[in-house]
A protein has these predicted regions:
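Core alpha/beta catalytic barrel or barrel-like domain that forms the active/cofactor pocket
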Residues: 81-90, 118-140, 162-188, 208-227, ...
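Structured, charged N-terminal subsegments at the starts of enzyme catalytic cores
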Residues: 50-135, 139-143, 150
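Acidic, glycine-enriched catalytic cores built around paired aspartates
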Residues: 1-52, 60-70, 80, 283-284, ...
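Well-ordered, non-membrane alpha-helical segments in soluble/globular domains
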Residues: 56-70, 100-115, 144-160, 193-202, ...
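A cross-taxonomic marker for long C-terminal extensions/tails that follow the last structured domain
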Residues: 190-193, 197-274, 279, 289-341
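Generic recognition of flexible, low-complexity loop/linker segments
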Residues: 73, 171-174, 244, 251, ...
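Active-site-proximal structural scaffolding
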Residues: 101, 126, 178, 189, ...
Length: 492
């Protein structure tokens, strides 16, 4: 397998600005083929997530990339210089989409054939374009083992089976390559994240793997538990993963799924160095759509280059796990109390947030509409955009529960939280409580922890949304949401 990629381009729809290669309001279909080429050739990403989770994906992406951009992929081999990594649904939690995963797995040998034909035509050695599949919302190792075993036995394994008169499937239609694929668990829920070490150990042992890439979410934990809790859960999970790896004798290669909004990770081109310093244990970072399309191209290239050049994969610093999880419990409870109050308004506002990718909506505990307590919420990007639209950065929610001792602990354990808080607080508008039934004193308590100058242009945009929402002017609400998103350089 090639070296572990450092920068994974994803298709998360958090961008305020549309890229040059899309004609409409939504990135879809053939746009995403061009996007995969663009992020590799022009931006310098060394991996692209090809996403089938909650959206339509193209099973012929490899063939299209090689046929349209043959000169480029002659030099930058698909599968080596640029890795295409598929994300599919998790059958254990998405029953209505379960067979899509099987279709994805069946397409991998066909993609290999397309790449092998391309290599033969250009006098090159064959390289498998797809090495791994990401399975989302993982809660146990069985969900990973089933995928790997299905591919080995029922996809690649069918080649040796007799189809008629002693003739094997391989003799009939050709070999099935690669012989096996690895599975990357995407772990998003608190209890599963805190058991990530157990999940990875069981998977690595069952499949006799010496190394495992493990994908830790940053966005959905923030939606479910609040911003400070999301980072502390990740830091504890990473500490446990590395401890397990040392005990068992395997290598773990963590991926962090961070977005540009402070609430969703605060990974922007300007903050590339700060993010790698906050998470030196991580080897691969996601760059989502806002990172790529809401900043000048040269700034984006420089940010990606810094992510690639950073010294990453260091063992984590020791962390007092009990103390960290005590803060998680308290702030998550305070966060949930505030979300309980604002959920109906957030759901109304989310209807005005522009779509940036063609997606399908599913509802479930950890499905595409998320739940906090008893409340169904929009997906993380729509949720974040809705709150920013009225000047309520969600990083503030739950943070009023921090004690002085908690603040001291965070200063020593995860000082980046204060950067996230400072970057978010610029966009606070005290008038947000006109539409959100929140106690202003509690909402503003975290602001005392940072010095910040408010962004006047953004406040004007949020004033526009608040006033338009109050009078029922839907078009003005949409206009204000777009204006504010462009100002802060992310949608949600």
């Amino acid at each position: 397998m090639p070296d572990v990629p450092r920068v994974m381009s994803t298709q998360h729809p958090d961008n305020a600005t549309l890229p040059f290669f899309t004609a409409g309001e939504v990135i879809e279909g053939e746009d995403e083929i061009q996007e995969a080429y663009y992020v590799s050739s022009h931006l310098g990403c060394d991996e692209g997530m090809w996403d089938f989770e909650g959206k339509e994906g193209d099973n012929y992406a490899v063939k299209k990339l090689l046929s349209r951009y043959d000169d480029y992929f002659t030099d930058c081999r698909l599968g080596e210089g640029f890795r295409l990594t598929i994300r599919g649904p998790n059958p254990a939690l998405e029953a209505s989409e379960a067979k899509i995963l099987l279709e994805i797995l069946e397409s991998i040998p066909r993609s290999y054939d397309a790449a092998a034909l391309f290599a033969d035509e250009h006098g090159l050695e064959s390289v498998s374009p797809i090495h791994e599949v990401i399975v989302p919302m993982v809660t146990d190792a069985d969900q990973l083992n089933a995928v790997e075993e299905y591919y080995r036995s029922f996809v690649a394994g069918k080649g040796s089976r007799s189809v008629w008169n002693g003739r094997t499937v391989e003799e009939w239609v050709g070999p099935f390559e690669p012989a096996e694929i690895a599975v990357i668990p995407l772990i998003e829920e608190r209890e599963a994240m805190l058991r990530a070490d157990e999940i990875v150990r069981e998977y690595a042992t069952a499949q006799d793997r010496e190394s495992v890439r493990v994908f830790l979410a940053r966005s959905d934990p923030a939606l479910n538990y609040g911003s400070v809790a999301a980072d502390l859960i990740n830091k504890v999970a990473l500490a446990r993963l590395y401890r397990m790896a040392d005990d068992v004798g395997i290598d773990v290669h963590p991926i962090l799924g961070a977005g540009s909004a402070p609430f969703r990770g605060n990974l922007t081109p300007e903050r590339a160095d700060a993010t790698t310093a906050a998470y030196p244990e991580v080897e691969t970072f996601t760059v989502q759509s806002a990172f790529k399309y809401d900043n000048p191209v040269e700034t984006v290239r420089e940010g990606i280059d810094r992510l690639k050049r950073a010294e990453l994969g260091a063992p984590p610093e020791p962390i007092d796990e009990d103390r960290a999880l005590e803060i998680v419990d308290r702030t998550a409870a305070a966060y949930a109390d505030q979300v309980d109050v604002i959920a109906p308004t957030v759901n109304r506002l989310s209807a005005y947030v522009p779509d940036r990718r063609a997606r399908k909506l599913h509802v479930g505990l950890f499905g595409y509409s998320r739940e906090v307590g008893e409340n169904a919420l929009p997906r993380a990007i729509g949720y974040t955009a809705s709150l920013y639209a009225v000047g309520c950065p969600p990083t503030l929610l739950g943070a009023h529960a921090l004690t002085d001792d908690d603040v001291t602990f965070l200063e020593g354990t995860f000082p980046a939280f204060f950067d996230h808080l400072r970057d978010a607080a610029r966009y606070y508008n005290p008038r947000c409580t006109d539409v959100l039934d929140l106690e202003r004193a509690r909402l503003e308590t975290p602001l005392e922890l940072v010095d910040v100058e408010p962004d006047d242009g953004h406040r004007e945009a949020t004033d526009e949304v608040i006033d338009a929402f109050d009078r029922g002017d839907e078009e003005a609400v949409r206009s204000g949401i777009r204006r504010g998103a462009r100002r802060r350089r992310f949608l949600g």
